[in-house]
């Protein structure tokens, strides 16, 4: 969210950046002093749906203005548990095929706490740790409108389409 917002603000300094997603925790993230000037608003899918309903807008009746192909398939997979670490692992293997990548990805706050305690105790040295607060990842956030398995499938299809349609490969080359 923050990296994208900063990129937008760099190209368009007067832009208002709105993060729209299933994650209510992004609201807290956007309030951090280091983020406030980058992300102007955060709304969940549920909130956006309510806004559309209040205004009598049916998004399905609005014609698409085109597709965005400025993100990699790997980046679009971040919302599903394991997606962040998978993207990093794939990128490392692209540049350094012989490097072993130790990954621990966990879902849910209890599991995140456990793996962080293990890391603090030195039992996960050298590991890339991905912790998703919501079981299933961001697609299972409090502001999600559809069943989590459906959301995962949709994200996976977007990843597949992005990889296929993107002008560059997954690593920006």
Feature-to-residue mapping (PLM):
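Iron-sulfur-associated redox domains of electron-transfer enzymes in respiratory
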Residues: 1-173
């Amino acid at each position: 969210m923050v990296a994208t917002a900063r990129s937008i603000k760099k190209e368009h300094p007067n832009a208002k950046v709105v993060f729209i997603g299933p994650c209510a925790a992004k609201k807290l993230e956007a309030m951090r002093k280091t983020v406030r000037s980058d992300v102007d608003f955060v709304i969940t899918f549920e909130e956006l749906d309510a806004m559309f309903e209040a205004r009598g807008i049916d998004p399905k009746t609005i014609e698409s203005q085109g597709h965005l192909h400025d993100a990699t398939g790997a980046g679009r997979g971040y919302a599903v548990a394991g997606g962040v670490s998978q993207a990093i692992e794939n990128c490392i293997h692209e540049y350094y095929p012989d490097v072993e990548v130790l990954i621990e990805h966990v879902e849910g706050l209890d599991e995140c706490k456990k793996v962080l305690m293990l890391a603090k105790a030195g039992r996960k040295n050298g590991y890339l740790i991905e912790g998703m607060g919501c079981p299933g990842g961001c697609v299972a956030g409090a502001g999600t409108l559809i069943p989590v398995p459906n959301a995962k499938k949709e994200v996976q299809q977007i990843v597949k389409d992005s990889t296929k349609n993107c002008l560059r490969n997954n690593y920006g080359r």
